[in-house]
Amino acid sequence: MPSSAFLPRALALTAAALLAATAAASPAHASAPPPGEADTPLAPGAAYKAAYDTLGAQRLTPAQRRLDAAKQARAADTSATARGAGAALAGYKLSGALHQSQKTSYWCGPATLVITQSAHDGVAGRSQQDAATLLKTNTSGTAWYGVDINVPGPTGYPMADALNHRLPGAGYVPRALPYTPTATDKANFKQHITHNTDHDYAIAGNAWEVPGGPHLVGHPNIEIFHWVSIDGYNTDTAAAQVDYLDPVGGVSTSVISWAGSVPKSAHISSDTLTTIMGGRGYVW
């Protein structure tokens, strides 16, 4: 399902249009939870997501599985090192991503691509049109999975493929999340944002906000599919809070009616953000 702000189910850019645009989704939906986590209480909004998500299982390629395992091992080491250095790194540590406001109501994906890319190479002002073309973004948004873009060896994950194409050697890999992320999912995300930030990379997060569930800062209590760039973490709390850049920030209310309440940059609990991304995931 594509995921771009703002796309509430009841408006012209409907979830039905989104569902028609791609045909696959998260493997985490059907996977067994880690031992001891089978009884994790349903996250707020999880039942809604389960009821309305018609996407099937997604697949990581063998190369992506190997890369994810290798990065996970490195991330665990990075997180442990960061905890040891916490006193010296008081406050938020950022990767330095450069914000852009999305140019249309459905270009949060292209904006997130150029923002996330800028965290590593420091280049501002890249074309969102070029990013939209690369991602195969349409009026339904930018897909989480199920779209092969025009790069060598596409995997079906357009954001991951675009980032790896534009940042050779970056090793971006998608991490899918279940509707109710487990304690392990939340701990892994803390390790991943620590690892990426410490290595000068941001994370592209694919949010699925639903009525009754948690929302990003300034977002209304409606269903919204959205991409954001997660560019740092709180060293004082071992990444219990993170910093993210929201492409809706700075957008005219004539384009997105509720944009006026959305900051360009915001802090949020990492557990809350992990829950918001449940049913989709992030590219780290």
Regions found by a protein language model. Give the residues of each.
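Secretory targeting and sorting signals
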Residues: M1-A32
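Conserved active-site-adjacent core of cysteine acyl-enzyme catalytic domains
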Residues: S31-T54, R65-T81, T137-W284
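Active-site nucleophile-adjacent alpha helix/oxyanion-hole segment immediately C-terminal to the catalytic cysteine
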Residues: G91-G141
